[in-house]
Amino acid sequence: MSKLIKGIAASDGVAIAKAYLLVEPDLTFDKNEKVTDVEGEVAKFNSAIEASKVELTKIRNNAEVQLGADKAAIFDAHLLVLDDPELIQPIQDKIKNENANAATALTDVTTQFVTIFESMDNEYMKERAADIRDVSKRVLSHILGVELPNPSMIDESVVIVGNDLTPSDTAQLNKEFVQGFATNIGGRTSHSAIMSRSLEIPAIVGTKSITQEVKQGDMIIVDGLNGDVIVNPTEDELIAYQDKRECYFADKKELQKLRDADTVTVDGVHAELAANIGTPNDLPGVIENGAQGIGLYRTEFLYMGRDQMPTEEEQFEAYKEVLEAMDGKRVVVRTLDIGGDKELSYLNLPEEMNPFLGYRAIRLCLAQQDIFRPQLRALLRASVYGKLNIMFPMVATINEFREAKAILLEEKENLKNEGHDISDDIELGIMVEIPATAALADVFAKEVDFFSIGTNDLIQYTLAADRMSERVSYLYQPYNPSILRLVKQVIEASHKEGKWTGMCGEMAGDETAIPLLLGLGLDEFSMSATSILKARRQINGLSKNEMTELANRAVDCATQEEVIELVNNYVK
């Protein structure tokens, strides 16, 4: 008899295969064992650190190729932990001063750090705790000579079942053999869920108990479309889901026909579908999925995974490569957005209790112009190789935009005096991520050339709900009428001044949000490249006039639930 387990649909698709349980390795050791060869034990610890660095670097590089630079950035954070003297030195001191064995010293010190970070009322610091825990486990495995589970070694078709998949687990999945995965914990915004969508592997998270209900080798079905796991399906269920899987693949093949099609509603209104990228390595997916431009080029990934700033020349080459590859299509480049959840070891940024509201993005760039100016110079030099737009992140006041623009114009003049050619057709815009910016959109619209709404931050700042916190995840509401009203206000302000508005947050590719955004008049939808064809088909089947009526009704709703019900009734 089959068993149904419900979870959260994290990545589309249907997987049918035997279960492969990720078994936790035995990392037990004698905590009380003292060592006599202190120097040898320190060397053993240092060797484990170096082995972990080599391992993580390989995983990071593999993740960048398979998933893109933005998804690989989590491993930059892990590598930073391994280089942090505030963590490493106390471990070495404990071995030397207390004759502790390396495993005990490692776990005692990292446990202290994890406890401190987890006790902070700050989700960013709690994420740091998770990084330290993951890295500590890897180092401990090298100290003890125990191999961690390595999904890359799987050589038969399986569905992976585990309590959770770490980023390194997910990055090592071989798509040829891993058909899907299901976990006890996690949500749609967890690292494993995000990576599974990039890999296009069906995934279900948050089942709570799947590791207790599935045995090694059980036949299971993962329905990533509905969030269902069927354990040991009946013959009829197997046939039904095989048909469902075939329909899913046929549908994906059908979508490919839209690669070179226009994005236009049934009543003739055009929309632009663009892609979000982190590095030039992401370009093949952009082109394969028929993106009409790049709506967000996250330049911070040029700065990560290294021990010094990228030079102006290195940046110029990267920007030039992207602009040339897009062959005249618009490329919107976001200037450096460091701080908050992204750190650089060589900048020595101060620790802040609430880094998401602190010294980051345009605030950092205006204060440290030795970082900002080389980037602007590289962008200006690259501008002659395509259609370049530049936008500044985390702008809260009109004075910040004016100061950033003044610096850019100053560097433009400097470059011309040096004999460089610079395009005269560069548009300057801002990210709208802060409610104050949305409230003053009419003021900004008189001076900027365009807006790009960053809904990921706008939602969490408006509703005061950290999107990475499970405790307040119910408040992270993309369809809340307050968010829709802010989006409407920004779009209307831009159109009144003859400007355009794009969106580059997760919401831009969301099938429930797309009808609303179309109705609100959004000009550009920028999303993960893998979402573009599905969004194109959806928009091509909608009426702009009807969606305008829908959006006008949605902004008058009182709750997110009312908005979702309204959309479901309109779009069937």
From Swiss-Prot:
Cofactor(s) in the UniProt record: Mg(2+)
Subcellular location: Cytoplasm
Catalytic reaction annotation: L-histidyl-[protein] + phosphoenolpyruvate = N(pros)-phospho-L-histidyl-[protein] + pyruvate
Any Gene Ontology CC annotation: cytoplasm
Domain text: The N-terminal domain contains the HPr binding site, the central domain the pyrophosphate/phosphate carrier histidine, and the C-terminal domain the pyruvate binding site.
Self-association state and partner proteins as the record states: Homodimer.
Record's protein name: Phosphoenolpyruvate-protein phosphotransferase
Native source organism of the sequence: Staphylococcus aureus (strain N315)
